[in-house]
From Swiss-Prot:
The gene is pheS. One of its GO terms (cellular component) is cytoplasm. This is Phenylalanine--tRNA ligase alpha subunit. Binds 2 magnesium ions per tetramer. PANTHER family: PHENYLALANINE--TRNA LIGASE ALPHA SUBUNIT, PHENYLALANYL-TRNA SYNTHETASE. Tetramer of two alpha and two beta subunits. InterPro entries: aa-tRNA-synth_II, aa-tRNA-synth_II/BPL/LPL, Phe-tRNA-synth_IIc_asu, Phe_tRNA_ligase_alpha_bac/arc, Phenylalanyl-tRNA_Synthase, WH-like_DNA-bd_sf, WH_DNA-bd_sf.
Length: 511
């Protein structure tokens, strides 16, 4: 039930005046009538009526009218007569006249005379033969509907078309065809009607009291503010929904991850998306017959199909590691390593190749991370995409060990807001290796969210690195699915404005 007194107190003074205008009236009112009775301007009436309509107290009905008026030429025709009328008047007492002489007597120029002759014949008032014009009858033709309409418009200035009788509407059609005589424009009409709810407010009693729009220093100093009337605030009023520009949620998480690693003292690095198999696979001690290299798992680039290998010393060291284990003490993979296979161009399948490049170019101690897109020939499903983002990182130094790695990962996941645990795992290029699992309290379950380990000697020695190196990797889309409670990974790349607008602007992200 409405609190009528509270609502009335919250109304603007102009809204009250619009309602007061309906006292003693059950009919809709024009804005002009309200403005005149309440001594306010039309603009204020319309503004207040719009506010009242939004709350259901009045209805603003809109209608459009077409209004016809005379142009400057039309006024001339109304005063002096249409060209055909002036021609027929000039023919009075004459059996016939040559066209130029008739035009001169009628006071018409060549163009006006041509128009007049056409209408003279169309109305059946005259005829033309061998350049001579004559009247059909000795009697002066009666004024037509078009002439009566011109006279009416000259007298009244403008007329609503819907108010014209049918005869004059037909004449208006003819005058519209004679360009430049009449002007037709649309005007909007508004009427305002009081609703049942508005009538309840009016019957409750509305008092018009001037409101204070601001409290000045003088009001405060003199105490006059205590006697001023203030309009109440409507804290229940509906507010407009605002859809500001927002950063995409995936970009927000990437920025959050970047921020965490930068605060932990890491350096950011990037690498090419089109990579050689050498950096993507061989450098990481992945054999050339490994299943991950198959066409069904990796995108091979057609152009350029091959890339240059790095310096010969590095290539030879990687070859030795694969074939015999080199100087690492390992037996390697015991096969004949092929340079042509290593030169093949691929879309990188992980960002670990960035770590390999970084280690080959920089001396430990170091801490590096990289965020970028990776590509795998995955069938698109609710949890797999052929293109996604990955964050990769390494820590290298004499004192770096597996326990340091676990500590860094624990701190990283803590900053993301997750409890983490570690389970033993296997990866081709790390040993010891672990999988990171985070706990989801709402599901009371653990979910795998990344892998990590210590780079094997077969990876490090060819790169010339003599210190231990800890490495880790994480799929960012999977993290986004958990963070935003998404069941289908494809949602991250669909233009679902409803979902995007519903996400919080800030809050759980450390930006």
């Amino acid at each position: 039930m409405m609190d009528l007194d509270r609502i009335i107190d919250q109304l603007h003074i102009y809204e009250k005046k619009v309602l007061k205008a309906f006292e003693g009236s059950d009919k809709p009112l024009k804005p002009e009538e309200i403005a005149e009775s309440q001594k306010i301007d039309i603009k204020s009436v319309m503004s207040a009526s719009g506010a009242l309509e939004s709350r259901g107290f009045v209805r603003v009905m809109k209608d459009a009218d077409e209004v016809v008026s005379l142009t400057e030429d039309g006024e001339s025709c109304a005063r002096e007569g249409l060209p055909e009328r002036r021609l027929i008047e000039a023919l009075k007492g004459e059996e016939e006249l040559e066209m130029s002489e008739l035009s001169r007597r009628a006071g018409l120029d060549k163009k006006e005379a041509g128009i007049g002759i056409g209408w003279l014949m169309r109305k059946g008032w005259g005829r033309i033969s061998q350049g001579m014009v004559s009247a059909v009858s000795d009697e002066t033709p009666e004024r037509g509907a078009d002439e009566r309409l011109l006279e009416l418009l000259l007298e009244r200035g403008s007329v609503r078309i819907r108010e014209l009788p049918d005869e004059l509407r037909g004449a208006l059609k003819d005058l519209k065809g004679r360009k430049g005589i009449v002007d037709i424009r649309k005007i909007k009409r508004h009427t305002i009607e009081l609703t049942t709810e508005g009538r309840k407010l009016l019957e409750r009693g509305i008092e018009i009291v001037e409101e204070a729009t601001q409290v000045t220093h003088e009001h405060l100093k003199s105490g006059a503010w205590r006697k001023l009337h203030y309009r109440g605030y409507n804290i229940d009023a509906e507010y407009p929904l605002v859809y500001p520009g927002k950063m995409h949620p995936l970009r927000r998480i990437i920025d959050e991850i970047r921020s965490i690693f930068l605060k932990l003292g890491f350096t950011e690095s990037r690498g090419p998306i089109v990579e050689s198999a050498f950096w993507n696979f061989d450098c990481l001690f992945q054999p050339q017959d490994h299943a991950a290299r198959e066409m069904q798992d990796t995108f091979y680039v057609k152009n350029p199909a091959v890339t240059d290998l790095p310096c010969e010393d590095l290539v030879r060291a990687v070859q030795d590691a694969h074939e015999t284990g080199g100087s690492t003490g390992s037996e390697g993979w015991q096969y004949e390593w092929d340079r042509d296979v290593a030169r093949q161009s691929v879309l990188r399948t992980h960002t670990t190749c960035v770590s390999a490049r970084f280690l080959s170019e920089n001396e430990p101690p170091l801490k590096m991370f990289s965020v970028g897109r990776v590509f795998r020939r995955e069938t698109i499903t609710y949890k797999h995409l052929p293109e996604f983002h990955q964050v990769e990182g390494i820590v290298a130094g004499d004192e770096v060990n597996f326990r340091n790695l676990l500590g860094i990962l624990r701190e990283f996941y803590r900053k993301l807001g997750f409890e983490v645990r570690f389970r033993p795992a296997y990866f081709p290029y790390t040993y010891l290796s672990t999988e990171c699992e985070i706990y989801l309290p709402e599901k009371k379950s653990w979910i795998e969210l990344g892998g990590a380990g210590m780079f094997r000697p077969e990876v490090l020695e060819p790169l010339g690195v003599e210190t231990p190196v800890a490495a880790f990797g994480l799929g960012i889309e999977r993290l986004a699915m958990i963070r935003f409670d998404i069941k289908d990974i494809r949602m991250l790349y669909q233009s679902d404005l409803g979902w995007l607008r519903g996400l919080p602007v800030t809050g759980d992200l450390e930006l």
